[in-house]
């Protein structure tokens, strides 16, 4: 079965429609995996969320940082930023149903020797461990104490993974790796300030996928999140955030032959707003 991985949508539903039409023209039965950030910053977050959910068993998603931010806004823990575009979801009649569906989605997904995450994987983690750690977060996010979890989810520390981490620190570190990481130090310590392209990598840092002794190199990690990176295709790394909401393109990749389908996008946000 053909599978297409699709980059960050961020509420760009018109481009999602165009992309799905192009996919259906060549592979109408293809499975779809969205690498997170379904909503926010684009003009049609509600319609995008509804459409992805309506794809049913044909599609899977992993949660991105903007999706988690939506959950926090929905339960009153965070106020929308000026650049957030989720008011349509907050006012929707089916808001609670959509939020409940969203919080039951995974943060990591393994399929056919591919590991799907939104942002990245720490070098200490194998693919199997990444999925297992994701399940720890999902168990809380899908449980009765999910709002309390979101209250404690935000923060940059601990920025270095240790298997002995417990409780909120452990879950926060997992979430930050799977949904926020771009650069890290050689030991895997995460940096949350740098958002540059590889050509402007800050001294002492490296992209997470170049960290030495990365344990997930035996599988292909498929991710989004990093719009300044653009389309990145390496033997065991595929980056698919091609800046749709910033005026770039929305990208889908056939994971069998690595051919791409792209749709040009208007600029809905100006660079400089992460």
Curated annotation (Swiss-Prot):
Covalent S-S links between cysteines: none
Pfam families named in the record: Metallophos (PF00149)
Provenance organism: Janthinobacterium sp. (strain Marseille) (Minibacterium massiliensis)
Catalytic activity: P(1),P(4)-bis(5'-adenosyl) tetraphosphate + H2O = 2 ADP + 2 H(+)
Keyword vocabulary terms for this entry: Hydrolase
Name of the protein this chain belongs to: Bis(5'-nucleosyl)-tetraphosphatase, symmetrical
Molecular functions per Gene Ontology: bis(5'-nucleosyl)-tetraphosphatase (symmetrical) activity
CDD domains: MPP_ApaH (cd07422)
Similarity comment: Belongs to the Ap4A hydrolase family.
EC number of the protein: 3.6.1.41
Protein's job: Hydrolyzes diadenosine 5',5'''-P1,P4-tetraphosphate to yield ADP.
InterPro entries linked: ApaH, Calcineurin-like_PHP_ApaH, Metallo-depent_PP-like
């Amino acid at each position: 079965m053909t599978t297409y991985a699709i980059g960050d949508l961020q509420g760009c539903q018109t481009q999602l429609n165009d992309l799905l039409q192009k996919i259906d023209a060549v592979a109408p039965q293809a499975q779809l995996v969205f690498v997170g950030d379904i909503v926010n910053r684009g003009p049609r977050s509600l319609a995008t969320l509804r459409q992805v959910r309506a794809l049913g068993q044909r599609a899977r998603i992993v949660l991105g940082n903007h999706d988690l931010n939506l959950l926090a806004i929905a339960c009153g823990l965070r106020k929308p930023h000026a650049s957030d575009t989720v008011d349509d979801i907050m006012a929707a009649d089916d808001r609670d149903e959509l939020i409940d569906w969203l919080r039951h989605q995974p943060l990591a997904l393994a399929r056919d020797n591919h590991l799907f995450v939104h942002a990245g994987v720490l070098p200490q983690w194998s693919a199997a461990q990444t999925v297992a750690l994701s399940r720890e977060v999902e168990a809380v996010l899908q449980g009765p104490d999910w709002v309390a979890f979101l209250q404690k989810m935000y923060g940059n520390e601990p920025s270095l993974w240790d298997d002995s981490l417990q409780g909120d620190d452990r879950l926060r570190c997992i979430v930050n790796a799977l949904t926020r990481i771009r650069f890290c130090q050689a030991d895997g310590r995460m940096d949350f300030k740098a958002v540059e392209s590889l050509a402007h990598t800050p001294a002492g840092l490296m992209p997470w996928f170049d960290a030495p002794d990365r344990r997930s190199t035996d599988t292909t990690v498929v991710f989004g999140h990093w719009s300044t990176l653009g389309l990145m295709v390496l033997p065991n790394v595929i980056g698919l955030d091609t800046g749709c909401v910033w005026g770039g393109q929305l990208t889908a990749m056939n994971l069998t032959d690595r051919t791409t389908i792209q749709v040009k996008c208007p600029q809905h946000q100006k660079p400089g707003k992460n």
